[in-house]
Amino acid sequence: MNVGTAHSEVNPNTRVMNSRGIWLSYVLAIGLLHVVLLSIPFVSVPVVWTLTNLIHNMGMYIFLHTVKGTPFETPDQGKARLLTHWEQMDYGVQFTASRKFLTITPIVLYFLTSFYTKYDQIHFVLNTVSLMSVLIPKLPQLHGVRIFGINKY
């Protein structure tokens, strides 16, 4: 028996999306966002779907592809300090179940949004640009790449 040792991850960011119930909670949070936006009077259904998609993708971009480091004091001696949450997830292994889920979710939301906006040109362009802004950083070829030095430090 090891007294005084903890059984935890070196970096908790690596396994947070593999926790029990996190996928269901994520989908329910998107649904709750949509219901809250639907409750705003005088806002049409297509606008609500577009807002749901844009807010979701903006949050995903900020939390997964912009914020770097960990909110915890980790014993990894700063290895995760320069990595985004997406790069830390599953220890950087590509094509895991969590990464696939987080890649497919904005695509499904995009299809739903396109359908409910009846493929209106303005909504379609906004939603497509939003989708590309969260899908392109997820590509394995862009792992650790900082385009034009943005978010380098």
UniProtKB/Swiss-Prot annotation:
Per the record's keyword annotation, is Membrane included, yes or no? yes
Underlying gene: ORMDL3
Which stretches of this protein does UniProt put in the Extracellular compartment?
118-121
What name goes with this protein? Answer: ORM1-like protein 3
Q: What is known of its domains?
A: Ceramides bind to ORMDL3 N-terminus and stabilize it in a conformation that physically restricts the accessibility of the substrates to their binding sites in the serine palmitoyltransferase (SPT) complex, hence inhibiting SPT catalytic activity. In the absence of ceramides, the N-terminus is flexible and permits substrate binding, thus liberating SPT from inhibition.
The function of this protein is: Plays an essential role in the homeostatic regulation of sphingolipid de novo biosynthesis by modulating the activity of the serine palmitoyltransferase (SPT) in response to ceramide levels. When complexed to SPT, the binding of ceramides to its N-terminus stabilizes a conformation that block SPT substrate entry, hence preventing SPT catalytic activity. Through this mechanism, maintains ceramide levels at sufficient concentrations for the production of complex sphingolipids, but which prevents the accumulation of ceramides to levels that trigger apoptosis.
Cytoplasmic side stretches: 1-21, 64-94, 143-153
Its domain of life?
Eukaryota
Keyword set includes Transmembrane helix: yes
